Swiss-Prot record:
Official protein name in the record: Large ribosomal subunit protein uL14
Annotated transmembrane regions: none
Cited InterPro entries: Ribosomal_uL14 (IPR000218), Ribosomal_uL14_bac-type (IPR005745), Ribosomal_uL14_CS (IPR019972), Ribosomal_uL14_sf (IPR036853)
Lineage: Bacteria, Pseudomonadati, Pseudomonadota, Gammaproteobacteria, Alteromonadales
GO cellular component: cytosolic large ribosomal subunit
Length: 122
């Protein structure tokens, strides 16, 4: 469950290391975002000479949460850290590599690129 002010790791090579959620997209009073939801983020920590600079604002898709996601068979997939992948205005990933596992819930038409770049799909 990601809400405003939540900090997330960045799971792509866009150059950002940590981001902070500044808005959960998808409704005027929407409070929480889960895996596969799009949020608006601000870059809080970045590596030098990278595409994403500190203070930049991007869209991002949540790929891992501590809260996890419940499957129809009753199992729950949880992670140690919250993580997101930065997106451009066309909702395509900015980076060319994805770090760490992603869940099968991202296998929608919109995020197939992220699933194909990920080293592991759970």
């Amino acid at each position: 469950m990601i809400q405003m002010q939540s900090t997330l790791d960045v799971a792509c090579n866009s150059g950002a290391r940590r981001v902070q959620c500044i808005k959960v997209l998808g409704g005027s009073h929407r409070r929480y975002a889960g895996i596969g939801d799009i949020i608006k983020v601000s870059v809080k920590e970045a590596i030098p000479r990278a595409k994403a600079k500190k203070g930049d604002v991007y869209n991002a898709v949540v790929v891992r949460t501590k809260k996890g996601v419940r499957r129809p068979d009753g199992s729950v997939i949880r992670f140690d850290r919250n993580a997101a992948v930065l997106l451009n205005n066309n909702l395509q990933p900015i980076g060319t590599r994805i770090f760490g596992p992603v869940t099968r819930e991202l296998r929608t038409e919109q995020f197939m690129k992220i699933v194909s770049l990920a080293p592991e799909v759970l």
